[in-house]
Amino acid sequence: MKMNKNHKTVLVILNIIVSFLISSCSSPKEQVRIGNGTFTIEGKDVQLICGEMHYPRIPHEYWRDRLKRARAMGLNTVSAYVFWNFHERQPGEFDFSGQADIAEFIRTAQEEGLYVILRPGPYVCAEWDFGGYPSWLLKEKELTYRSKDPRFLSYCERYIKELGKQLSPLTINNGGNIIMVQVENEYGSYAADKEYLAAIRDMIKEAGFNVPLFTCDGGGQVEAGHVEGALPTLNGVFGEDIFKVVDKYQKGGPYFVAEFYPAWFDEWGRRHSSVAYERPAEQLDWMLSHGVSVSMYMSVSYTHLRA
């Protein structure tokens, strides 16, 4: 079939329109890749040297100061729990302002040259009241926490959806600095309900968090706490055991100790907890020299006073 000049012009225009529509509808470029034993971020292999930092426990006016200090001590990443009961104190009423403005905390971290690892729970532990669960859940009769109880999951979904509205625009794939998101928290030390874990995993994805997901557990709890589609990471595991445990689930890693404990917390009225610096310094040096990514829990000290 012979085409005249006008037909060719129309086809060229149609091709341009189709190409534009395809590019505008395509998903954001994947900026974080996990594989070959490493985290690849924006095309570069990165060893995560991270520190845990809790925005509600630092006065708002000191956020930037603490983030600057984190960068100055050689960290390239901060890890942050999100505390559900800090944002939804009444059912369906969310607060992300002032001290609760976690989006500002994350943007400030980006301005200071830091990646962020987000740990939204819904359960977080963190030596925080009710593990981060809102107290109004206690009024719900016959509600089973940390389970696939449909009512419980509906509350989790409402919280995670709202969190997605606030924070999913800040993933690195969307131009921000959130590089990974954690599914639940040390669930393997509590139960082994894979359907529950999968439900939380899917909620996080559906909320718009388009970066790699991970779980964290002690070495003996990974089997119970791991869920398909998430990188298994470790808490309080050192030396060659890091490789042995992770390789059972993701051969070749990458290897990430999501909670490395250089010290421990004090409890009011009890003897001060102290750790000689030599042993954790030796453990940290070993991990860094063997390419293991690590997050120090904690990187900033706090006093948490109970009501």
What is each stretch, according to the model?
Residues 43, 78, 109, 181, ...:
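Conserved, mostly hydrophobic/aromatic
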Residues 2-12:
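Bacterial N-terminal signal peptides that target proteins for export
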Residues 66-69, 98-105, 159, 163, ...:
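A general structural detector for well-ordered alpha-helical segments in enzyme core domains, enriched
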Residues 12-21:
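Bacterial N-terminal signal peptides
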Residues 25-77:
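N-terminal carbohydrate-binding accessory modules
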Residues 118, 122-155, 163-298:
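Substrate-binding/catalytic cleft of secreted carbohydrate-active enzymes
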Residues 303-307:
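Conserved small/polar residues in nucleotide/adenosyl-binding loops
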Residues 64-72, 79-128, 205:
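Aromatic-lined substrate-binding rim segments of carbohydrate-active enzymes
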